[in-house]
């Protein structure tokens, strides 16, 4: 048996190999047993030991021999069990060899012994449950370490005045701490890994479905499973991304290996898995439902192959209908993105997948993505790690280090955008001096993160547990003012962000009679168009309002600070672009006139909303409604002229 190119070629045909195995069995083994009175079980043990020593290069011959031996399946499993038990004995320093796992996996695949028979020897009693308990405890400990601060993790202080000798004298001299029991041997897990490497998926499918935590605790098992997934995804829809780039060296020597994935090729050697027919019986998948069924046992642990995640997102983006993909995106892809830490490339692929969905459907995905973070230990750990990184970045961010802070902010947001932006908005509600540096730092975000940020902003604005006004009932709460100002600055600076959800939310709130959220509309107009609510007018503004449309627009514009005329002109151009985007969004979503009507209705209805409200609060609310109504009306009028005025070509036609 030798390696040639990408396959392993045998030097003899199966018929010749079977004949040689039969001849050796009759003339050598059985004859020696009868002539010398050898122990038959001991002979079987020697055969299996020889098989183990030559499993990589000569497994076909030994399989032919084992198929013809006179011992029963139970007897072969028993002898193998004794070999496994030898390596779990406390006096044995060697670990179980990989060749023994490979030998057993081949025998199970060839139906010589069954997986259930071997499982009784390699994982007796409650070994699997103990391994799961140890894995859960490790995750819990890691999560607790992330949530603890440096003070709680520090060692207790020593009292200098306390007599250490007296303390030591009270401790019995013969007291010895009991050593913790050794962890159970994961032989059963490694046997499953060997079976997956050999392509025996049907034998372990039920066991993996009952114990999905194995994929998270033992990444090598996941890699062996994903190898089968990649092979079965070799279909026209997946083929372009599945193609692997083989080595180009012509002088490389092929070397057999029993490890999966194969070791990286060197300048002189290329490694090939020794079992050449590992993919026998695994046909390529033709239906999307079959792909989901194959990936279902992995759950969120598909995160261990970021290339596969990108491939699935690309295929989903090209799908004519995404209804079949939605459960898969909710339960596996989005949580896997959190654990994969794939950075911006993975988020770009995910955005291509979901950008065509309507925003209510996208936001439902984001909401489940966020709230699913508390259901698994791995996701809880990722959530707490993201929260800690977000707080650390916000403590260091300032207007002086926007470039460095922006890159750090984007890198931290890539892992879990929903959780990260929740922390950012919570800090902005308390510290409005973070608005400007955070807005400037957001330029490194991906389109998906811009969309998630809009969702997080909408969720923060609609929080029913926070009061919209202060205790005096007159002034708007600081948290709402901060969020409104942040929203206006954000939508003005980044054209990739869509403010349609915020405008629709304002329309819904006004329809319910809630006027406190009008401050969000006012800030959007102020920040994006530069039109501020009219307060006490100066003489110059009064004179400008008596002029034409251009002078009236100048009277409503906010004061633009600038050291040079060029800076002022640049700021004016930015306001014009932001105003056009806002007006276009209102017109395309048919919200311009409904919002105008709703604001006008609230101006009339706000004074009759509640009989118990103080007259000062009512008058303040009425003044606010009137001011914002005039602000919004002037915004619509000033930009409606740009859309309705005929062009020179239209004038010539008329």
Predicted regions and their residues:
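Acidic, serine/threonine-rich, charge-biased low-complexity segments
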Residues: 1-269, 278-279, 283
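Amphipathic alpha-helical elements of HEAT/ARM-like alpha-solenoid repeat scaffolds that form extended
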Residues: 44-47, 62, 204-210, 291, ...
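Conserved small/polar residues in nucleotide/adenosyl-binding loops
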Residues: 643-650
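Extended amphipathic alpha-helical scaffold segments
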Residues: 31-35, 45-53, 191-195, 205-213, ...
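Flexible helix-coil junctions and inter-repeat linker/turn elements that act as hinges
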Residues: 53-57, 75, 213, 217, ...
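Long alpha-helical HEAT/HEAT-like repeat alpha-solenoid scaffolds in very large eukaryotic proteins
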Residues: 392-395, 450-604, 617
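Amphipathic alpha-helical scaffolding segments
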Residues: 65-70, 226-231, 348-356, 367-374, ...
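Alpha-solenoid helical repeat scaffolds
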Residues: 176-184, 192-196, 255-327, 334-418, ...
